[in-house]
UniProtKB/Swiss-Prot annotation:
Name of the protein described by the UniProt record: Pre-mRNA-splicing factor SYF1
GO CC annotation terms, alphabetical: catalytic step 2 spliceosome; intracellular membrane-bounded organelle; membrane; nucleoplasm; nucleus; post-mRNA release spliceosomal complex; Prp19 complex; U2-type catalytic step 2 spliceosome
Modified residues (N6-acetyllysine): K420
HAT repeats: 15-47, 48-80, 90-122, 124-158, 160-192, 198-230, 235-268, 270-305, 369-407, 498-530, 532-566, 571-605, 643-677, 679-713
Subunit organization: Associates with RNA polymerase II, the TCR-specific proteins CKN1/CSA and ERCC6/CSB, and XPA. Identified in the spliceosome C complex. Component of the XAB2 complex, a multimeric protein complex composed of XAB2, PRPF19, AQR, ZNF830, ISY1, and PPIE. Identified in a pentameric intron-binding (IB) complex composed of AQR, XAB2, ISY1, ZNF830 and PPIE that is incorporated into the spliceosome as a preassembled complex. The IB complex does not contain PRPF19.
Chief location of this protein within or outside the cell: nucleus
Keywords from the UniProt entry: Acetylation, DNA damage, DNA repair, mRNA processing, mRNA splicing, Nucleus, Phosphoprotein, Repeat, Spliceosome, Transcription
Similarity annotation: Belongs to the crooked-neck family.
Listed InterPro entries: HAT, HAT_Syf1-like_N, HAT_Syf1_central, HAT_Syf1_CNRKL1_C, Syf1-like, TPR-like_helical_dom_sf, TPR_rpt
Length: 855
């Protein structure tokens, strides 16, 4: 039941409450200044009609006007009550008045100001809203202005009132100057580009400015250049030319874009000739190919657009294009620009490095057909290039300059150029030497032989002050007398044009200066030999040998010894031996083989056979390991030819001891084959037995097949058994090698035994050995399978004096100790039948005696 009551207080004659409100009313009467009591009461009355709820808020605020909680909830509730009403409804004005009343006490609360301003923005009352924002900024301390300004700026941007917004932004930038980019973007959007350019220029020049968008100073510069260059009619307060040129000095890595921006500014301003001047200045000053490409492409596009506009204008006026002189001029200008591109690009590269010799040569080639420009280019090049900073060979510029004059018939001018070149302080002696050689070649091409000799003799003359060839502190003019290039050319000219004595003097001088090469020494000796001065040529070889060490002296020794043997043969055998011993003393193993073979040939032809064998024996020790096998082959061949094959047994034995397993195996087979030919079956069998220790049956099946064939032909039951026993022993030896087993385990995949990685963690130490044992058992089983199967046919070895009856009886008996040969062995011995064995008498091979048989 609802009970309506009226309070007896005279100040509240209209206050009405229900029976459920009595407890809250009584509590309020006891604690009327308690915010919590009022809030509990208000929370209880949330479902009551809006006037009753508002009345309750008013009662509370009258007693507690400084309660932020009450005001915040009350204002929020009042705004919610009018949310779906028309903004012209009088209720909105009542809510606004409530906010104004609240600010009498709550003017320091930014949250209430923000809610009120947002409420006014929703009503669309622009002036009232702007003034309220201003009141909020005045009422709040400056530390809390940052909470008001974002909403204020959003309000300013939401209405097409640029002047109001500009004034607001200017005030905001005083508080937050780092937000200048936001203001600049607004100015651009509102088409106030002049002020935007001013603000952007200020930002760019402020070194302390940090972009909120993370833009670099160059990016801001680029925005400024684009802004002022693309809007010349709207940006009036800035000196665009000065700004962009200032950027050219600051941002040297982006010159192309800045130059294009400056030219674009003048193009949009209608100053086309000024824009063309900017382009020309740009392509003559940029330092990189990238910048040049940007500027040149923009320049060419500008000229094309000008020509297209001119042609369109002419067509509209009805004039013939052929009669338009201005159009012809523009076309000619555009063609000249395109034709100048390679030369302009070359200029860019030379501005990067004016000492780049190759680029100067390319520049000359670009002027092909224009002699005056070529001469000017060469002159500029030789004056610009510093030999100590040059990239390339600077002397080639002088030589090419002289060659240009020579090709055009101006021989005197060419001589003058080369003479000046000989006085240039080059960095390398070789440059000056090349110039002197070109001087000589110039005279030779025009058949001035005496002048050529005179020039080269002048170049090689001793200077007043001698200097070492590599002494960088001395000018190259004092060091060129030691240049081998000049001396070599002089020696060639003396051989062709001079006398024997003058040529000999030149070669002697080269040797005295110790600048000769092995080829120079050989040339000198050959020159003396051609003139029948044999001993002098040998002396030249000796002098050359004293100048060089191994391996450079190798060619000199080879030529010297060959010439000496060809000259004297066996007449000066002791001297030849001394020369060989001298050559071999200190000779590296790499070069010893040729000398030893030459030495042995000398002994074979003119000396003693035992001396030749001694030389071969020394050679097998002196050469490189890779050449020992070839050396032993030669040694064995020569020993067999001279002394007979029996003399090679010791050589074979030594070769087997020295050579690697692969080559030793081949030597053993050859050795055993030789013994077989000599009828020494036991010696051959011993060799096979020795060699078997280095022959793994799995990889050297050819050896075991050879031994098996040998035993089938020459052996008996016991020898074959011994061979098979040795084979099993060797195979077991190789099987038990841990390294081999490990490598085999890695190769086996998917086997039943598995791998170490398949084991459980913690068992690797014990199970590694288990796997090795399993693998060993597997390999042993394979070895058992590899053993020869029991033969179906029997090979019986019988005495040669057995009768046919005994042979037949033996053929029918089963031998309990018969040899188990494999199927392949059975096939090889199918032809052997237990018939009579015929013994043939063989003659001694002729190779046994060698060359001694002839004696």
């Amino acid at each position: 039941m609802v009970v309506m009551a009226r309070l007896s207080r005279p100040e509240r004659p209209d206050l009405v409450f229900e029976e459920e409100d009595l407890p809250y009313e009584e509590e309020i009467m006891r604690n009327q200044f308690s915010v919590k009591c009022w809030l509990r009461y208000i929370e209880f009355k949330q479902g009551a009609p809006k006037p009753r709820l508002n009345q309750l808020y008013e009662r509370a605020l009258k007693l507690l006007p400084c309660s932020y909680k009450l005001w915040y909830r009350y204002l929020k509730a009042r705004r919610a009550q009018v949310k779906h009403r028309c903004v012209t409804d009088p209720a909105y004005e009542d809510v606004n008045n409530c906010h104004e009343r609240a600010f009498v006490f709550m003017h320091k609360m930014p949250r209430l100001w923000l809610d009120y301003c947002q409420f006014l923005m929703d009503q669309g009352r622009v002036t009232h809203t702007r003034r309220t924002f201003d009141r909020a900024l005045r009422a709040l301390p400056i530390t809390q202005h940052s909470r008001i300004w974002p909403l204020y700026l959003r309000f300013l941007r939401s209405h097409p009132l640029p002047e109001t917004a500009v004034r607001g932004y200017r005030r905001f930038l005083k508080l937050s100057p780092e937000s200048a980019e936001e203001y600049i973007e607004y100015l651009k959007s509102s088409d106030r580009l002049d002020e935007a350019a001013q603000r952007l220029a200020t930002v760019v020049n402020d070194e302390r400015f940090v972009s909120k968008a993370g833009k670099s100073n160059y990016q801001l510069w680029h925005e400024l250049c684009d802004l002022i260059s693309q809007n010349p009619d709207k940006v009036q307060s800035l000196n665009v030319d000065a700004i962009i040129r200032g950027g050219l000095t600051r941002f040297t890595d982006q010159l192309g874009k800045l130059w294009c921006s400056l030219a674009d500014y003048y193009i949009r301003s209608g100053h086309f000739e000024k824009a063309r001047d900017v382009y020309e200045e740009a392509i003559r000053t940029v330092m990189t190919v990238r910048d040049f490409t940007q500027v040149f492409d923009s320049y060419a596009q500008f000229e094309e657009s000008m020509i297209a506009a001119k042609m369109e204008t002419a067509s509209e006026l009805g004039r013939e294009e052929e009669d338009d002189v201005d159009l012809e001029l523009r076309l000619a200008r555009f063609e000249q620009l395109i034709s100048r591109r390679p030369l302009l690009l070359n200029s860019v590269l030379l501005r990067q490095n004016p000492h780049h010799v190759h680029e100067w040569h390319k520049r000359v080639a670009l002027h092909q057909g224009r002699p005056r420009e070529i001469i000017n280019t060469y002159t500029e090049a030789v004056q610009t290039v510093d030999p100590f900073k040059a990239t390339g060979k600077p002397h080639t510029l002088w030589v090419a300059f002289a060659k240009f004059y020579e090709d055009n018939g101006q021989l005197d001018d060419a001589r003058v150029i080369l003479e000046k070149a000989t006085k240039v302080n080059f960095k390398q002696v070789d440059d000056l030497a090349s110039v002197w050689c070109q001087c000589g070649e110039l005279e030779l091409r025009h058949e001035n032989y005496d002048e050529a000799l005179r020039l080269l003799r002048k170049a090689t003359a001793l200077p007043a002050r001698r200097a070492e060839y590599f002494d960088g502190s001395e000018p190259v003019q004092n060091r060129v007398y030691k240049s081998l290039k000049v001396w070599s050319m002089l020696a060639d000219l003396e051989e062709s044009l001079g006398t024997f004595q003058s040529t000999k003097a030149v070669y002697d001088r080269i040797l005295d200066l110790r600048i000769a090469t092995p080829q120079i020494v050989i040339n000198y000796a050959m020159f003396l030999e051609e003139h029948k001065y044999f001993e002098e040529s040998f002396k030249a070889y000796e002098r050359g040998i004293s100048l060089f060490k191994w391996p450079n002296v190798s060619d000199i020794w080879s030529t010297y010894l060959t010439k000496f043997i060809a000259r004297y043969g066996g007449r000066k055998l002791e001297r030849a031996r001394d020369l060989f011993e001298q050559a071999l003393d200190g000779c590296p193993p790499k070069y010893a083989k040729t000398l030893y073979l030459l030495y042995a040939q000398l002994e074979e032809e003119w000396g003693l056979a035992r001396h030749a064998m001694a030389v071969y024996e020394r050679a097998t020790r002196a050469v490189e390991p890779a050449q020992q096998y070839d050396m032993f082959n030669i040694y064995i061949k020569r020993a067999a030819e001279i002394y007979g094959v029996t003399h090679t047994r010791g050589i074979y034995q030594k070769a087997i001891e020295v050579l690697s397993d692969e080559h030793a195996r081949e030597m053993c087979l050859r050795f055993a084959d030789m013994e077989c030919k000599l009828g020494e079956i036991d010696r051959a069998r011993a060799i096979y037995s020795f060699c078997s220790q280095i022959c793994d049956p799995r990889t050297t099946g050819a050896f075991w097949q050879t031994w098996k064939d040998f035993e089938v032909r020459h052996g008996n039951e016991d020898t074959i058994k011994e061979m098979l026993r040795i084979r099993r022993s060797v195979q077991a030896t190789y099987n038990t090698q841990v390294n081999f087993m490990a490598s085999q385990m890695l190769k086996v995949s998917g086997s039943a035994t598995g791998t170490v990685s398949d084991l459980a963690p913690g068992q690797s130490g014990m199970d590694d050995m288990k796997l090795l044992e399993q693998r060993a058992e597997q390999l042993a089983a394979e070895a058992e399978r590899d053993q020869p199967l029991r033969a179906q046919s029997k090979i019986l070895f019988v005495r040669s004096d057995a009768s046919r009856e005994e042979l037949a009886e033996l053929a029918q008996q089963v031998n309990p100790e018969e040899i188990q040969l494999g199927e392949d062995e059975d096939e090889d011995e199918m032809d052997l039948e237990p018939n009579e064995v015929r013994l043939e008498q063989q003659s001694v091979p002729a190779a046994v005696f060698g060359s001694l048989k002839e004696d």
